[in-house]
Amino acid sequence: TAYFISTEGRPGPVVLELPSPIAQFQKAKLKPIDEIQLIDIENNNIPNVYNEIKIRKSNLNELIKSIEKSKRPITVAGGGIYNAGAMKELLQFSILTDIPFTTTLMLIGAMPKHKLNLGLPGMHGFPENNLAIYNSDLVIYIGARLDDRIILDPEKFAPNAEIFWIEPNNPGIGNKIANRVKKVEVDAKESLRYLIANLKQIKHEKWLEQISSW
């Protein structure tokens, strides 16, 4: 279970707390190995540790409606895309919906060159990308943190946009745009696959031309 937790959702270290008799090397009654329930990760024989990993269709369906009516959408993609192995799905989603995407430092270099791949946003990014976010009417955060490297001024960050945050775990939203963010607690790859399966081809030629002009 600890190994599963460390690799699923938002990967990271897991602290194992041992009972004091074991930690102090005292005698302890341990189950024989054949009585321990083993986890078969390859065959998905995994305890139900994270209910939030399952697709929450209601939240994704709300995002689909917003995508369908949006005229100036943009995606902010981060290292969670790489951790989920969802690079192909991100590109497929972007091509299907004609939505340009920016990549944070944790994803830069993992996505191929493409007209929809705008590169870095925020304090280390390109001015035109920040202009695109500022003038957007829909921002889709996926696999990226809501940090101050991109959200330089919360009051001026995409002031006229809906903001969706696709994040499989529930770390909370600890910044000044929390009241504007719609949380979608879904794995990046699964969410993109669901969106691809339930969206039709969309074009945003005028929006892309506007971004190019900047």
Map each language-model feature to its residues:
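Anionic-ligand anchoring segments at beta-strand to alpha-helix junctions in alpha/beta enzyme folds, i.e.
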Residues: 55-56, 62-139
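Short beta-strand segments
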Residues: 15-19, 76, 141-143, 167
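Short internal beta-strands
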Residues: 17, 98-105, 164-167
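Phosphate/diphosphate-binding loops
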Residues: 122-173
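Glycine-rich beta-alpha junction loops
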Residues: 18-24, 79-81, 170
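Short acidic, glycine/serine/threonine-rich loops at helix termini
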Residues: 26-31, 85-89, 112-117, 150-154, ...
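Conformationally flexible catalytic loops at phosphate/diphosphate-handling active centers
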Residues: 5-69, 208
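Phosphate/pyrophosphate-binding active-site segments
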Residues: 41-46, 50-51, 58-61, 65, ...
